Amino acid sequence: MKIGIIKETKTPVDNRVALTPEQVATLNKQYPNHRIVVQSSDIRAFTDDEYREKGVEIVDNLSDCDILFGIKEANIESLIPNKHYVFFGHIAKMQAYNRHLLQAMIEKGITFSDYEYLVDDNKERVCAFGWWAGVVGVYYTLRGYGLRTKSYYLPKPDITFTLEKLLNNLSAISLPAVKILITGNGRVSHGAQYVLNYIKARQLSENEFLSTENVNSISYTVAKAESLVKKNNNETFDSLDFKNNPQNYHSDFGRWAKSTDILICAHFWTAKAPVYLTSEDLQDAKLRIRMIGDVTCDIMGSIHSTLRSSLTLIHTTIIIQLQKKKSRHSLV
């Protein structure tokens, strides 16, 4: 079998890659009956020469490969008919913005495997960006808040950024006394919590967060699904039922919207689940939220300020009150 690592073709560009030069070289040696080649790319985090130095073949054409691995959605024009592609497709939730990609793959006779739905024998996902998305998501959100308020400055991350550099940047500034809400308690949420704990943000209980008007230092809480929704007919919340039948629940986010300065969305959402912030909610003069870091980035999903994906890893929204009306601006 011949396996190809594709050049990332989505706009905006993504410099991540499925396998490093060392990993490709190891796999080629360990499985001599199979071969992995890498499509030439000038945007990848690893250069072509770094792969060549490990004895990996760099090619321009992948048409003789059996399986093609990428990271983000492949550009429709780059799709090779009758191949098996593996990447994060963002189509399983029937996302409207990728409908044309799905149609193109069907028309071209392509077999598609989505990393997001690969699980082990225990039904646990084997591949996820989660934790790192939460880490970077918090940084971008706090960076956006600083730009909005002009109270501090954080540099925009680039390819040279490491976790240590990110944490050092946050530790070097004086962060304001704001209340941060993290929704969800999965990998993304844990990454966000890691950063906030590192910078010694105070963790509040849900009751403390909702009952405390102002805080003396940067503070946060984590709201799980049972605190964000209520079951219709006032029935008891059931996590398995919510997962299988989210349409039987409605949003209880209003109380959080009145108590939160910065919202970091780290929850899982599907089209049948409740919307937490509608367009009408965003116009409400009682809305306290001034910054949204939507790490989930579901377009017009649970947060209706997310109109498109941004040039960064998350979609950041600032909400400005002008004569009791709200306008939304994306920061990149």
Feature roles, as predicted:
Residues 9, 40-43, 73, 117-120, ...:
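Short, ordered loop/turn segments at secondary-structure junctions
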Residues 67-149:
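Phosphate/diphosphate ligand-binding glycine-rich loop within oxidoreductases
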Residues 10-41, 153-259:
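Glycine-rich phosphate/diphosphate-binding loop of Rossmann-like nucleotide-binding domains
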Residues 81-116, 262-322:
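ADP-ribose/adenylate-binding Rossmann-like module
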Residues 3-104:
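An N-terminal-biased, well-structured beta-alpha scaffold segment characteristic
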Residues 111-168, 291, 296-332:
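Adenosine-phosphate binding glycine-rich loop
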Residues 50-64, 222-287:
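A structured beta-alpha segment of the ubiquitous adenosine-cofactor-binding alpha/beta core
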